[in-house]
From Swiss-Prot:
Glycans are attached at residues 55, 93, 127. Residues 21-136, 185-195 are extracellular. This is TM2 domain-containing protein C41D11.9. Disulfide bonds: none annotated. Pfam families: TM2. The keyword Cytoplasm does not apply. The chain crosses the membrane at residues 137-157, 164-184. It is found in: Membrane. Keywords: Glycoprotein, Membrane, Signal, Transmembrane, Transmembrane helix. One of its GO terms (cellular component) is membrane. The keyword Cell inner membrane does not apply.
Amino acid sequence: MLHKILFLICLASFIPTIGSISGTKDVKSKNCDGSAGLTCTFPGDCRIGDTVKVNCTSRKGCPNPVSRNNVEAVCRFCWQLLPGDYDCEPATNCSTSSTKLLVTKCSAHSSVICMGQRNFYKRIPCNWSSGYSWTKTMILSVVLGGFGADRFYLGLWKSAIGKLFSFGGLGVWTLVDVVLIAVGYIKPYDGSMYI
């Protein structure tokens, strides 16, 4: 019985320590600049797209408490913001030929007031490019394909050396490469899209 009581006392003294440690991490990771450091109360009859007056107070854990009343804001969730009102992490794992949508993490600008979480996921078009031109690759493949110039240009140096020493597979490898580049199968070494 005594060991159960001691266990509960130890557990009770340990739990606030865990909470204070995780609370400290949250405060350091929170952005307290501008509207990002505010918690705003939108009216209950708020209709999406309407301009409303909101009352805002500083978030818990942000230094320098601030209270702003009757601030004009558009009634919308953060994920409904216009593209200029948020930033997203760049998409770097796209395929070369498709323009599919990719899920990425976005966050609202600190000057924007919106409902819900300021960090959200959004589907954006996948169009990451590192500057390789499809036209230049096609020209290199047709004109100097037998020497592997197209593959050297794309950063595929291992297969380019093989193509160089076999004279483009005596022309066969060159013809196949022209078709593969035309349909977008051969892509730059980093997986980016052509410009």
